[in-house]
Regions:
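A short, structured loop/turn motif at beta-sheet edges
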Residues: 53-60, 85-90, 109-118, 142-148, ...
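Acidic, glycine-rich flexible loop segments
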Residues: 101-102, 120-139
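Short, solvent-exposed aromatic-acidic interface loops
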Residues: 67-72, 97-103, 126-128, 154-159
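A structural detector for short beta-strand units
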Residues: 50, 80-82, 104-106, 138-140, ...
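Polar/charged side chains located within well-ordered beta-strands of beta-rich proteins
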Residues: 64-66, 80, 140, 151, ...
């Protein structure tokens, strides 16, 4: 993973080097699109189209943006924004905010073998506004192979135990 990755920056100079603390995640940089499906005991199963973007500004984190819309009619479904950090070798942290009033800090393991990146994360902190649904447990699994990103999300919410909620397969569209 010794590749240098650059990104346009809003700061003078315009292009910045990837911070060495997150160089192990360089292969994630860019835009990914694909399809996923969701289910939960309290809702009808659904399918969605997704776009995920990983970027950087030369600091020790990646920026993360996620947007989904319904396959059936294109209406917006969900969004997340946040940051990915590598505090130590083999460790990863995600700091995420949802427009539904939920924030989460997930921590876990990071494994890089050849061109494959794997992350196993569990929420250590979940914050909620007074009007947000009762989400009390979250965990995620990510696997990135060259130009292919898959993930699953497990959730415990509204009186239900932690269980499968989402799965998606995305393909790189822009580095």
């Amino acid at each position: 993973m010794g590749r240098r990755r650059f990104a346009r920056s809003p700061y003078p100079g315009g292009v910045v080097d990837l911070h060495p603390d997150i160089a192990v995640l360089a292969a994630l940089l860019g835009t990914w699109t694909g399809r996923g499906s969701g289910e939960y005991p309290t809702i009808e199963p659904f399918e969605y189209i997704e776009e995920v973007t990983f970027g950087h500004v030369g600091k020790p984190f990646l920026s993360y943006g996620h947007r989904t819309r319904a396959v059936s009619d294109g209406r917006p479904l969900h969004a997340e924004t946040g940051y990915v950090r590598v505090p130590a070798p083999g460790r990863v942290e995600w700091v995420l905010a949802h427009p539904t009033g939920v924030t989460e800090i997930e921590e876990g393991t990071l494994t890089v073998t050849g061109g494959v990146i794997e992350m196993e994360l569990t929420a250590t902190t979940i914050g909620r506004t007074s009007s947000a649904k009762d989400v009390n447990a979250l965990s995620r699994s990510f696997r990135m192979e060259p130009d292919l990103l898959t993930y699953t999300v497990r959730m415990g919410a509204v009186g239900q135990p932690l269980q499968h909620h989402l799965a998606a397969t995305l393909h790189r569209v822009r580095p």
